[in-house]
UniProtKB/Swiss-Prot annotation:
InterPro entries: PFN, PFN_euk, PFN_sf, Profilin_CS
Modified residues (Phosphothreonine): 111
Protein's UniProt keywords contain Transmembrane: no
Family: Belongs to the profilin family.
Entries under SUPFAM superfamilies matching the protein: Profilin (actin-binding protein)
Protein name in UniProt: Profilin-10
PANTHER family: PROFILIN
Annotated source species: Phleum pratense
Disulfide linkage: 13-115
PTM section of the record: Phosphorylated by MAP kinases.
GO molecular function term, any single one: actin monomer binding
Matches recorded under Pfam families: Profilin
Function: Binds to actin and affects the structure of the cytoskeleton. At high concentrations, profilin prevents the polymerization of actin, whereas it enhances it at low concentrations.
Length: 131
């Protein structure tokens, strides 16, 4: 299966009548492996900050997490594995695997829990595959 198929079939899938606003699979350096049509372009310093938060959980909490200049308030995640952010009625979940970052961005009516479930399910699968 191609990386684009993972995005199209596993991240942008319908959950209870809703789907993510955008999604992507990135390398740890921010290189886009696959993305949905409306996925925002990360800046290099944003990827650096995200990777630092995985290495040093809590790094982004004081300043917030920036994604394509949009600021997300960092909310509870899983140290070293998952970062979650909230911005207005939407938010973001980022799951780190051995080689990739699985990213899902949502808006209402999708819920934070639905976003996390979709992103983390694919991320956990990739971890089991050694990716």
């Amino acid at each position: 299966m191609s990386w684009q198929a993972y995005v199209d079939e596993h991240l942008m899938c319908e959950i209870e009548g809703h789907h993510l606003a955008s999604a992507a699979i990135l390398g740890h350096d921010g290189t886009v492996w696959a993305q949905s049509a409306d996925f925002p372009q990360f800046k290099p310093e944003e990827i650096t900050g995200i990777m630092k938060d995985f290495d040093e959980p809590g790094h982004l909490a004081p300043t917030g997490m920036f994604v394509a200049t949009a600021k997300y308030m960092v909310i509870q995640g899983e140290p070293g594995a998952v970062i979650r952010g909230k911005k207005g009625a939407g938010g973001i979940t980022i799951k780190k695997t051995g080689q990739a970052l699985v990213v899902g961005i949502y808006d209402e009516p999708m819920t934070p829990g639905q976003c996390s479930m979709v992103v983390e399910r694919l991320g956990d699968y990739l971890v089991k595959q050694g990716l």
